[in-house]
Amino acid sequence: MHTKTIFTMLTVASAATALTACADPTTTTNPASSTTTTASSATSYDISSIPTVDDIAALVPYDVKKRGTLRNGASTGYAPAEYMDADGQTPIGYDIDINKALAQVMGLNAGETKHSEFPTIIPALGTKFDVGISSFTITTEREQQVNMVSYLNVGSAWGVATGNPKNFNPSDPCGATIAVQTGTAQEEYAATLSDECVAAGKGKITVMPHELQTDIATKLIGGQYDATLADSTVIGYTSTQSGGKIEQIGETFESAPQGIAIAKDDAQLTEAVQKAMQYLMDTGYLTDILATYGADNAALTTAELNPSVN
C-alpha cells in the first residue's frame, strides 16, 4: 500500500477512521523513495520445501514455461512487502517470497523480481513482467485494466510500546504525540484528526513525521511518542523486528484486499496464478511466509479472481 486515500472522516470518538490504504499510481508520492525498512538484516522465507503441483504446472503458458521464470515487477520501497536488501540491489520482502513460492508451485526454475516505478508496473504486464506483486489494492478501476487475484487484506493500525506505558487510547487520540511515516495517508489522516480534535474542544495531536520506520520504532520504544499510526503489516513487522517491544493496540481498521496483477488477455497464466495462490493458502505456506515478516494476520483464505470491491 504505497500510497493511500482518505475518504469521509468519521467522528473523533468513534476511532473507526475512514482511512483506506491502497497502492495508487495517481499520487505524487514516489513509493521507491519512501522506504519503510525497519531492520538492516535481510529476512526471507525458505521456499525450497514447497513442491511443484503438476496439475497447476500444466496450466502455465508455454512461453513462461520455456523461460523458466515468473517475472515480477515491484516498487521496492515498502517494507515488509517489497524493499531492497542492504546491498541496495537485491529485492526482499514477503511479496518477493510469494512470487518465488508461486513459481515453485508452478514448476518453474525461479520467481524473479525487478524494481519498477509503481505507475509503470501494470502497463508492463504481458511484456516485461508476468505478474505485478507490489501491494496493489484491488479496485474496480484496476480490475478494468488487469486481472487481480486476491491474497491479502491490509488496513491501518495503531502501534505503541509494549504495555502501552503512555496509556494511549486509540478511541480518543486527542492530545497525543503520534509518529507517522512521511508521505503516507496516515500522515494526512493524523493531521485531519488533529483538526477535528481542536474543533471538538480537545487537545491537538502533535504529528511527528519520519522518513524511516526505524527512527519511529526507536523513539516510540524510548518513550518520546505516545503511539504510531501505520499499515497493519508495518506494525506487525515492526513488532517482530523490535523483539516484541512494540505492539498493536486496537483493531485494524479500513482494511482492503490486495491482489496479484496479471495481463487481462492472459487467461491461462491468470488461472495458473490463481490456483497456485489457492494452493499456498490451503497448505499454510502463505501464512508461513507472511509470519516471517510479522504479517500473517493479513492472509486471505480464498484466492478470488477480480472480486467485487467497493
Where are these predicted regions, by residue range?
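C-terminal motif of bacterial Sec signal peptides marking the signal peptidase cleavage site
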Residues: 18-21
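Bacterial signal peptide processing site
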Residues: 23-26
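Extracytoplasmic small-molecule ligand-binding "clamshell" domains
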Residues: 38-132
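Bilobed "Venus flytrap"/periplasmic-binding protein-like clamshell domains
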Residues: 91-105, 136-138, 155-212, 227, ...
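Acidic, polar ligand-binding/catalytic clefts
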Residues: 111-172
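Short helix-initiation/N-cap motifs at beta->coil->alpha
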Residues: 112-123, 165-166, 205-218, 256
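A ligand-binding cleft/hinge motif common to bilobed small-molecule-binding domains
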Residues: 136-143, 191-192, 221-255
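Periplasmic-binding protein-like
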Residues: 152-160, 236, 240-278, 296-310
